[in-house]
């Protein structure tokens, strides 16, 4: 459930460093960006990549928006009845729900309402866009990074990203390197206040975690879901959960002190 928590800080340094250019727009209620790093970036390839990602994000939003009464998820009956290309998102959400004991809970709204995949949908959309870009060969001639509201995936190449200070004071608390398929997502308070709820109680989370970033070797979907789970569980239980169920992922924690400061 990334909330603009991670931003691109810099590309990996080197002699004759390639130029970075981006295509940017609004999607799924946040900022979407496709960044390119190459010696002679082809403008038409960039536009094509932006169009492909835009189409992927629009499809996910059209199917998974709980705010649209006509969307597929608003009329959910069973996972077997959903569109085949959306089914992996449901299945992953339900799997994480089971493993986390409900800390991640697509049915947190209760009262017989259907699932809400907001805690995983943006990561899923990034993975869908990445697959479509790879299918047409975008990324072979240069490095490509997808960013959907802080859900990042390095489609190709090596990228450096910075975890923004969740206190709102600005600055970067730690840098990360993503390469060739790696993805990351962050959950924290940031601009939107207490938006993260414990799926077991429906109550906004209140603990000593300021933010947690999860890096996964291949899945933005998994990183998105796990960042929410770990924020809810807290550091001790979160680290244990990660080791038991997702040992190929790792977390970067930013904690509050006894006075509530980051």
Model-derived features: positions:
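Mature catalytic core of soluble alpha/beta enzymes
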Residues: 3-262
């Amino acid at each position: 459930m990334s909330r603009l928590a991670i931003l691109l800080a810099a590309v990996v340094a080197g002699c004759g460093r390639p130029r970075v250019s981006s295509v940017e727009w609004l999607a799924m209620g946040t900022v979407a960006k496709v960044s390119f790093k190459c010696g002679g970036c082809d403008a038409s390839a960039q536009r094509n990549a932006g169009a492909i990602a835009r189409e992927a994000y629009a499809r996910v939003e059209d199917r998974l928006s709980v705010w649209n009464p006509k969307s597929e998820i608003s009329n959910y009956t069973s996972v077997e009845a959903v569109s085949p290309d959306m089914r992996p998102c449901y299945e992953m959400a339900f799997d994480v729900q089971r493993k986390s004991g409900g800390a991640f809970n697509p049915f947190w709204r209760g009262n017989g309402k259907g699932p809400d995949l907001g805690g995983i949908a943006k990561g899923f959309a990034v993975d869908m866009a990445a697959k479509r870009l790879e299918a047409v060969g975008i990324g072979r001639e240069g490095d490509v990074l997808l960013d959907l509201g802080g859900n990042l995936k390095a489609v190709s190449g090596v990228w450096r990203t910075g975890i923004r200070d969740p206190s709102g004071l600005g600055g970067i608390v730690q840098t990360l390197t993503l390469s060739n398929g790696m993805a990351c997502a962050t959950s924290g308070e940031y601009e939107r206040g207490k938006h993260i709820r414990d799926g077991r109680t429906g109550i906004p989370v209140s603990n000593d975690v300021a933010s947690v970033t999860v890096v996964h070797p291949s899945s933005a979907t998994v990183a998105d879901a796990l960042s929410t789970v770990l924020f809810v569980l807290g550091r001790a239980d979160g680290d244990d959960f990660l080791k038991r169920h997702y040992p190929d992922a790792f977390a970067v924690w930013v904690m509050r002190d006894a006075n509530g400061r980051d």
